Swiss-Prot record:
GO biological process, one term: protein unfolding
Job of this protein: Involved in protein export. Acts as a chaperone by maintaining the newly synthesized protein in an open conformation. Functions as a peptidyl-prolyl cis-trans isomerase.
EC number: 5.2.1.8
Keywords assigned by UniProt, alphabetized: Cell cycle, Cell division, Chaperone, Cytoplasm, Isomerase, Rotamase
InterPro entries, alphabetized: PPIase_dom_sf, PPIase_FKBP_dom, Trig_fac, Trigger_fac_C, Trigger_fac_C_sf, Trigger_fac_ribosome-bd_bac, Trigger_fac_ribosome-bd_sf, Trigger_fact/SurA_dom_sf
Protein's recorded name: Trigger factor
Similarity comment: family membership: Belongs to the FKBP-type PPIase family. Tig subfamily.
Organism field: Shewanella oneidensis (strain ATCC 700550 / JCM 31522 / CIP 106686 / LMG 19005 / NCIMB 14063 / MR-1)
A Gene Ontology cellular-component term: cytoplasm
Taxonomic superkingdom: Bacteria
Length: 434
């Protein structure tokens, strides 16, 4: 086998590989003879079909298969010999056979050489937060509101009430599509409607008819309504006040607490809040570390890896439609290219961090991650056993552990300061509620 390597552009490489033509001819001949022994063709006894007949019928297909196998095998030998690391599958272009040699060209991309830079320039503000008794009480109050019952009242509507209404919306005196509803139910303070809508209902009683003035946000989804001033003619048909359940052992039973009553509920709530806080704190620090790593390291990315990631993101997006994708057009790659490129870059950079620091997934950490995740389920031991018996899930957890270890390695050289924050403030920002 003879090999020549050409760097075409960027990360693309072109291998020209020559192998003895007799190598292919022998393989083709052997394959034809094997086929002749097992072929069943009318007019010939089993195992007695002439090779010339087999060649006439199947020769082209057999030669094509053999050629593909020879190219694949010799390509692998060539990249090992040349110490090349392909990113994605190669494209093969077979050439002509001149009687002595068969030549083909393999074009592919390689992984970039990654040299980590600016690791000591990564700046991280590490948040410190804890779950207080007041935070637990606040969560219990939220749970009370979620389990509230509502009853009609003869008074003005206040924040927290539910109201029922009929309304008609108009812009410049003309009704717009989707702006009309009857027997519409809304909880005041929920933030479901555009700014000013809920506030305009406060202070009104059932049976009143009134008009409120609002302005659609510039980022509103309907193009024809963005930034437009509108009027809503409203007929308020009912005001319902919330009745919150008492905080006692019966309240605790609503959440499956059968022993220990209210104190057991508080313990469970605190445990869940601590778990969510720990995950959010880790995610916050990781996000800052990754942002610094990306900002200080610019590397060329293989298009093959980006294309592969685009396909993953596209598939995930289609699955979010509930699998009802049979008649849907394929989502354009442009929707995912930027995110895909970012994910590929992060993967390459973290891979280099793992390689440089010779990191291996720590078994104790892997089991800790599984236990933390399983604690959210009714029977954690069953979930832990399931993960430990599933090779694919275990590999996913090892990858998560390795990523955590890589972030921790980067933190050692980063400029880290600590900032104490309140639980509610931090979690609201982490979940996008702030």
């Amino acid at each position: 086998m003879q090999v020549s390597v050409e760097a075409t552009q960027g990360l693309e490489r072109r291998l020209t590989i020559s192998v003895p033509a007799e190598q292919i001819e022998k393989l083709v001949k052997d394959s034809l003879q094997r086929e002749a022994k097992r072929a069943r063709i009318p007019g010939f006894r089993p195992g007695k079909v002439p090779v010339t007949v087999i060649n006439k019928r199947y020769g082209a297909a057999i030669r094509q298969d053999i050629t593909g196998e020879v190219m694949q095998r010799n390509f692998i030998e060539a990249i090992i010999a040349e110490k090349l690391n392909p990113a994605g599958a190669p494209t093969f272009v077979p050439g002509a056979t001149d009687g002595e040699k068969f030549e083909f060209v393999a074009t592919f991309e390689i992984y970039p050489e990654v040299e980590l830079k600016g690791l000591d320039a990564i700046v991280v503000e590490q948040p410190k937060a804890s779950v207080t008794d007041a935070d637990v009480d606040s969560m219990i109050e939220t749970l009370r509101k979620q389990h509230a019952t509502f009853a009609a009242v003869e008074r003005e509507a206040v924040d927290g009430d539910k109201v029922k209404m009929n309304f008609v919306g108009s812009v410049d005196g003309v009704e717009f599509e989707g702006g009309k509803a009857e027997d519409f139910e809304l909880q005041l303070g929920s933030g479901r409607m555009i700014p000013g809508f809920e506030a305009g209902i406060l202070g009104h009683k059932a049976g009143e008819e009134f008009v409120i003035d609002v302005t659609f946000p510039e980022e509103y989804h309907a193009e024809n309504l963005k930034g437009k001033a509108a009027k809503f003619a409203i007929t308020l048909t009912e005001v319902l006040a919330a009745n919150l359940p008492e905080v006692n052992d019966e309240f605790a039973a609503l959440f499956g607490i059968t022993e220990g009553g209210l104190e057991a509920l508080k313990t469970e709530i605190r445990k869940n809040m601590n778990r969510e806080l720990e995950q959010a704190l880790k995610a916050n620090v990781k996000e800052q570390v990754i942002a610094g790593l990306l900002a200080n390291n610019d590397i060329e990315l293989p298009k093959a890896l980006i294309d592969g990631e685009v396909n993953v993101l596209r598939q995930q997006a289609m699955q979010r439609f509930g699998g009802q994708t049979a008649n849907m057009p394929e989502l354009p790659a442009e929707l995912f290219t930027e995110q895909a490129a970012r994910r590929v870059k992060i993967g390459l950079l973290l891979g280099e961090v793992i390689k440089t620091n010779e990191l291996k997934a720590e078994d104790e950490r892997v089991q800790g991650l599984i236990a933390s995740m399983a604690s959210a389920y009714e029977d954690p031991s069953e979930v832990i056993a399931y993960y430990n018996s599933n090779k694919e899930l275990m590999q996913n957890m090892r990858n998560v552990a390795l990523e955590e270890q890589a972030v921790e390695a980067l933190l050692k050289t980063a400029k880290v300061t600590e900032k104490t924050v309140a639980f509610e403030e931090f979690m609201n920002k982490a979940t996008g509620r702030a």
